[in-house]
Amino acid sequence: MAEEKLTFIPTADLVDIIGSDVRSCDTQFRDLGGVVEFCGKITTVKCFQDNALLKSVLQEDNPGGVLVIDGDASMHTALVGDIIAGLGKDHGWAGVVINGPIRDSKVIGQMEFGCKALGTNPRKSTKTGEGERDVTVSFGGVDFIPGEYIYCDSDGIIVSDEIVQPV
């Protein structure tokens, strides 16, 4: 059976559709990509000040996917720069949500790619490959579970265990 198509729905409308069980992320992210409204199936990476693993994930084809990166809210080193964001864009990803900073924000802001992050820091991360992939990550009062769905816009982030249909 073919998977249902995911259609972007504004997060405020999703709250109205889902109701009191809504999973809305409390963390206040900055919209730093050239695309503000994006959605997709969640893939996760948990890493701390090291971006080698997430770079390898974004080199995989994943049309419409969203990579949720938990950098433990460390602002010490950027986890994504223009090269890594470009890899994601070129491999079909809709965007990234980063519990940490990015760098090269001017270039990323001009890409047709969604990018929500806590802020910016020009400092590079290490590249040892440490981290975990496809594990549940939690921040902002929400569990981000691989295979579930994320909807992002200027109002925030909503996560759902199933595709939500517009009403």
From Swiss-Prot:
CDD domains: RraA_family. Pfam families: RraA-like (PF03737). This is Putative 4-hydroxy-4-methyl-2-oxoglutarate aldolase. The keyword Metal-binding applies. One of its GO terms (biological process) is regulation of RNA metabolic process. Catalyzes the aldol cleavage of 4-hydroxy-4-methyl-2-oxoglutarate (HMG) into 2 molecules of pyruvate. Also contains a secondary oxaloacetate (OAA) decarboxylase activity due to the common pyruvate enolate transition state formed following C-C bond cleavage in the retro-aldol and decarboxylation reactions. Substrate binds at G81, D82, I83, I84, R103. Homotrimer. It comes from Corynebacterium jeikeium (strain K411). Its cofactor is a divalent metal cation. Divalent metal cation. SUPFAM superfamilies: RraA-like. Its EC number is 4.1.3.17, 4.1.1.112. The keyword Lyase applies. Belongs to the class II aldolase/RraA-like family. The lineage of its organism: Bacteria, Bacillati, Actinomycetota, Actinomycetes, Mycobacteriales. Keywords: Lyase, Metal-binding. One of its GO terms (molecular function) is metal ion binding. It catalyses: 4-hydroxy-4-methyl-2-oxoglutarate = 2 pyruvate; oxaloacetate + H(+) = pyruvate + CO2. Gene3D superfamilies: Ribonuclease E inhibitor RraA/RraA-like.
